[in-house]
Amino acid sequence: NSVHPCCDPVKCEPREGEHCISGPCCRNCYFLRAGTVCKRAVGDDVDDYCSGITPDCPRNRYKGKED
C-alpha cells in the first residue's frame, strides 16, 4: 500500500508546508501559478486558467456552445 508523496498518511491532508494532493492545478504538491492553462478551449469557448490558490480548474465565465 503506497502513500501519496503529498499526503500526510495520518490525516490524509497535504503535508505541512505543501498546498495540495491532486487536481488539474496541483503539481508536485503545490498549486500551479495563476494564469496556467488547465483546460484548453473547445469550439467557441475560451481556455480555463488556474487561480494559483486552489487545486481545481475554475470555469471561466464565458460559456460557449460546447458547455
UniProtKB/Swiss-Prot annotation:
It comes from the Eukaryota. One of its GO terms (cellular component) is extracellular region. Gene3D superfamilies: Disintegrin domain (4.10.70.10). GO terms for molecular function: toxin activity. The keyword Secreted applies. SMART domains: DISIN. It holds the Pfam family Disintegrin. Its main location: secreted. Keywords: Cell adhesion, Cell adhesion impairing toxin, Disulfide bond, Secreted, Toxin. GO terms for biological process: cell adhesion. Negative results: does not inhibit alpha-V/beta-3 (ITGAV/ITGB3) integrin. The disintegrin belongs to the dimeric disintegrin subfamily. This is Disintegrin EC3A. It comes from Echis carinatus.
